[in-house]
């Protein structure tokens, strides 16, 4: 219902609506668990059930790992439905929002999966926590340059691996 109500506006203004995978925590048990669209087959089902080109899947690669899924597997299941990415690294436990390559996710496999599906959508670095400890303008500028370099290298790798 929610997305269907927004569709007329999406068409009128040429804006795509993205349905993102989520996770949540069980504080009593001290565990992270899946939530809306954390199962890639469920995610694909929701996008398909609306059957409109203005609805795409947004895969937050960090959320997928926290929910017990490998991002590359989710990418392959979502395929052409995937229109937006939230890219950041984590340790499979915490939503770290740090630069790719600074924690434990398998970026070789993730970029390969994106190339395999011919990914053409948005590529958003969601790395705000990386910048939390940067104190000066100079450090922040260096951090932004590093983030841009990593993002460009990832995009170039995806493009060079496309079949």
Which residue ranges define each predicted feature?
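Short acidic/histidine-rich active-site segments
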Residues: 122-130
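Gly/Pro-rich active-site loop or hairpin
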Residues: 28-44, 48, 63-120, 133-142
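C-terminal helical cap(s) of enzyme catalytic domains, especially alpha/beta-barrels
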Residues: 135-162
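Short, well-ordered beta-to-alpha junction loops that form the rim of enzyme active sites
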Residues: 20-22, 61, 127-128
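Residues that line or immediately flank small-molecule/substrate-binding pockets and catalytic motifs
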Residues: 82, 89, 126-127, 162
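Conserved, mostly hydrophobic/aromatic
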Residues: 17, 60, 85, 114, ...
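Active-site acidic/histidine proton-transfer and metal-coordination neighborhood
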Residues: 1-56, 66-67, 161-162
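Alpha-helical packing segments of well-folded alpha/beta enzyme cores
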Residues: 2, 6, 110, 147-154
């Amino acid at each position: 219902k929610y997305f269907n109500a927004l569709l007329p506006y999406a068409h009128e203004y040429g804006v795509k609506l993205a349905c993102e995978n989520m996770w949540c925590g069980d504080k009593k048990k001290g565990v992270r668990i899946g939530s809306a669209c954390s199962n890639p087959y469920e995610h694909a089902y929701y996008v398909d059930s609306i059957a409109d080109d203005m609805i795409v899947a947004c895969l937050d690669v960090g959320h997928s790992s926290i929910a017990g899924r490998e991002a590359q597997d989710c990418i392959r299941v979502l395929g052409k439905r995937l229109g937006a990415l939230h890219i950041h690294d984590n340790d499979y436990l915490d939503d770290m929002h740090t630069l790719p390559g600074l924690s434990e996710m398998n970026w070789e496999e993730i970029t390969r999966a994106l190339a395999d599906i011919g990914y053409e959508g948005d590529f958003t670095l969601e790395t705000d926590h990386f910048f939390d400890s940067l104190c000066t303008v100079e450090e922040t500028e260096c951090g932004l340059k590093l983030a841009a370099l990593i993002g460009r290298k990832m995009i170039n790798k995806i493009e060079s691996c496309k079949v």
